[in-house]
């Protein structure tokens, strides 16, 4: 299964965000690029939250998503948030995955409203990854608010749980992108490009991304 994006266009007033954008997504992929270039807008279009001005897409089947806002149920604890949207996910699996991502047993009992930003982000990531009937994953900056060790753990969990499902993961974190081991693309104008040997062997592209990250 693939996500096929053909000639998408989107404007907000006088600003063009996407122009004649096309991309064939086969399996898990990372999308990078400068802030404001249209990465989040692209995901919102694929989720049906924005309407494109032109173009079409196909292959987004029963998507699960990580948004820039975590959108947890504030009165529920982390386990219950996962079970609520897991479509048959059992509490034992939810608890196991949360503990593996650095939660202490006592923290599993806290309502989401009392969790830190990084903890909420980990719950949001697992909520998408553990949704049992999701066939497509659209993940917008899922590692925000995590330290280096938690990012490493989150990357391992993401790779394990995504499998080969069509996935677009947006990130400014070049190190995390490389750790994932997926195809890395850079959103530039109307294309999603990648150097022949990936960003790790393209110093100019890597430097651009690091500048973007440091400027945030």
Which residues does each PLM region occupy?
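Q-loop/switch helix immediately C-terminal to the Walker
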Residues: 75-93
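Conserved ABC ATPase "signature" region
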Residues: 91-107, 129
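ABC-family nucleotide-binding domains
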Residues: 140, 147
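Conserved beta-strand-loop-alpha-helix hinge in the C-terminal portion
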Residues: 187-216
């Amino acid at each position: 299964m693939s996500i096929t994006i053909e000639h998408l266009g989107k404007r907000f007033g006088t600003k063009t965000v996407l122009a004649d954008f096309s991309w064939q997504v086969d399996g898990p992929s990372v999308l990078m690029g400068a802030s404001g270039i249209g990465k989040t807008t692209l995901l919102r279009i694929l989720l049906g939250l924005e309407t494109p001005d032109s173009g079409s897409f196909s292959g987004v089947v029963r998507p699960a998503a990580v948004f820039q806002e975590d959108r947890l149920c504030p009165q529920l604890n982390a386990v219950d948030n996962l079970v609520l949207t897991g479509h048959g996910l059992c509490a034992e699996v939810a608890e196991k995955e949360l503990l593996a991502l650095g939660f202490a047993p006592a923290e599993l009992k806290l309502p989401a409203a009392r969790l830190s930003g990084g903890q909420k982000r980990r719950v949001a990531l697992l909520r998408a990854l553990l949704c049992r009937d999701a066939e497509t994953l659209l993940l917008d900056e899922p590692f925000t608010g995590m330290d280096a060790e938690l990012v490493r753990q989150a990357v391992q969990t993401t790779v394990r749980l995504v499998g080969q499902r069509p996935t677009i993961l947006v990130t400014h974190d070049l190190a995390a992108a490389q750790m994932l081991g997926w195809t890395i693309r850079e959103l530039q104008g109307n294309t999603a490009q990648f150097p022949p040997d990936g960003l790790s062997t393209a110093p100019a592209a890597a430097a651009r991304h690091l500048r973007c990250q440091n400027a945030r």
